Amino acid sequence: LVLGAVAGGWMLNGALKLWIGRPRPSTAAVTEVFGSSFPSGHAMGGTALWVALALVCLAGCRSVPARRAVLAAAVVLVVLTALSRPVLGVHYFSDVLAGVAGGLAWTLWLARIWPPEQKLG
């Protein structure tokens, strides 16, 4: 699930960047970044990774405090990854929102269709 979420999210992100082709913010010229701005690949990939890892951990976890800790960690890591992009000046806020939404949608869809015999828990 984790590999499928990250690899599929990366491919989906690349296709969307080619299709939309939005240029990066002008402040991105200060740093070495390549490619289109929309959607944020870091936000999409980070969301896919952290949500997939959380789903795998939650599948094997029955303790309510541990489940809350896993969810909190995933949320914090997604938010920190997402916020780093506009702070560094390499993405617009809308790029990041689209990246998080895309990563979340892709991973939840993948988790839903994943073969039942390969699911954890």
Predicted segment positions?
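Generic recognition of short, well-ordered alpha-helical interface segments
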Residues: 10-11, 48
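C-terminal TM-helix exit segments that contain a strictly Trp-centered aromatic cap at the helix terminus
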Residues: 12-21, 83-85
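Membrane-interfacial helix-loop-helix modules of multi-pass inner-membrane proteins that assemble, modify
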Residues: 17-33
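Short, well-ordered alpha-helical segments in soluble proteins
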Residues: 7, 20-23, 61, 80
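Membrane-embedded catalytic cores of phosphoryl/pyrophosphoryl-handling enzymes
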Residues: 29-121
